[in-house]
């Protein structure tokens, strides 16, 4: 299993949460068990996640829906991610992306930390079709969370 190999020979396993927390959480348990088995301690536990911080929770999903659907439909057309069997965008995004206002995004980040034990977040905040002004506003709000 690749996460055991990462524990054995890598410095850290970089999680890319495109499969959702339901699949990632058990893999993290396997990874941590393998780290213990191999006597390894990585310097950090990183994760890469799509993130959008809107001004209002009620509109955040709608603001980034088109660009993220475009991106993940492209992945599906390449055979990398099946979107055809998924329900709504909100269902697809749940436990896979961090989207909301400043309060809900901060809560989600805390939930990821608690559930996975991750301590380093690489937030992907820009996608084809998302206007640059929205990208910069989202990044500013993300920074406000931790300022």
Question: Where do the protein language model's features map onto the residues?
Answer:
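Active-site-adjacent structural elements that line small-molecule/cofactor binding pockets in enzymes
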Residues: 1-147
């Amino acid at each position: 299993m690749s996460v055991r190999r990462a524990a054995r020979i890598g410095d850290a396993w970089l999680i890319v949460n495109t499969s959702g927390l339901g699949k990632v959480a058990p893999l993290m348990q396997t990874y941590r068990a393998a780290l213990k088995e191999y006597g390894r301690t990585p310097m950090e536990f990183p994760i890469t996640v799509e993130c959008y911080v809107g001004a209002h929770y009620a509109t955040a999903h709608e603001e980034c829906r088109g660009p993220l659907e475009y991106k993940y439909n492209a992945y599906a057309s390449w055979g990398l991610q099946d979107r055809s069997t998924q329900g709504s965008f909100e269902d697809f995004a749940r436990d896979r992306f961090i989207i909301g206002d400043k309060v809900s995004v901060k809560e989600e980040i805390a939930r990821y930390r608690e559930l996975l034990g991750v301590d380093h977040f690489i937030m992907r905040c820009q996608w084809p079709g998302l206007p640059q002004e929205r990208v910069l506003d989202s990044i500013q709000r993300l920074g406000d969370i931790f300022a």
